[in-house]
Amino acid sequence: HRKGATRAFPANMDDVPAKYRDLGQPVLVPGSMGTGSWILLGQENSMNTTFGSTAHGAGRMMSRSKARRDFTESEVKKSLNDKGIFLKSLTRDGVVEETPQAYKDVDAVVNVSHELGIATKVAKLVPIGVIKG
C-alpha cells in the first residue's frame, strides 16, 4: 500500500505497462487548481530509495476548515481569474477549501523527486479551467 504516494517504477520493469516499458512508469502529480500539475517518469533510483514510489500530489498544508475561515469565494475566484483560469463550482466550499494557498508548492515537491532520481520531469501542465462538483 502506498499511503500518500504513487508508483514510480523505472523503465524495463515487467510491472510497467508495455507501452511505457521503454520509458518508465508515467506519474501524474497534481498541484492546486491555480498552479498546475506535472507529468513525470519513474527512474531506477526509486527502487532503491522509495520502494518504487513518489509523491502523488502537492499535498495540503492547510485544513479545509481553516481555508473556509480564511478565504472568501470571491477572492479565490478573482485570484484564479487574474491568472486566466476559468472556474465553475456548484458550492462556495468547493472553491474556498481548494484555494491554491491551501497546498504545498507542486514545483518544490516534484523537484525533490527529480533531484533524487526518483522520477524525471517530463512536462508541466498549466490550468486553464477548473470544474468543482
Tell me what each language-model feature is.
Residues 1-133:
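Domain-length cofactor-binding catalytic modules of enzymes
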